[in-house]
């Protein structure tokens, strides 16, 4: 979910703002999702959306 994603990014990249930096990234990051993921980040988001 988005909360877990946010925590993971903040742990990996201290000082980042994951929801504003990645909230609308690609077709799966953010609320809902569809389409074909084109990179590992989107595949991760797809797994958590499904």
Swiss-Prot record:
It comes from the Eukaryota. One of its GO terms (biological process) is arachidonate secretion. Inhibited by EDTA. It is found in: Secreted. It catalyses: a 1,2-diacyl-sn-glycero-3-phosphocholine + H2O = a 1-acyl-sn-glycero-3-phosphocholine + a fatty acid + H(+). PLA2 catalyzes the calcium-dependent hydrolysis of the 2-acyl groups in 3-sn-phosphoglycerides. This is Phospholipase A2 trimorphin. It comes from Trimorphodon lambda.
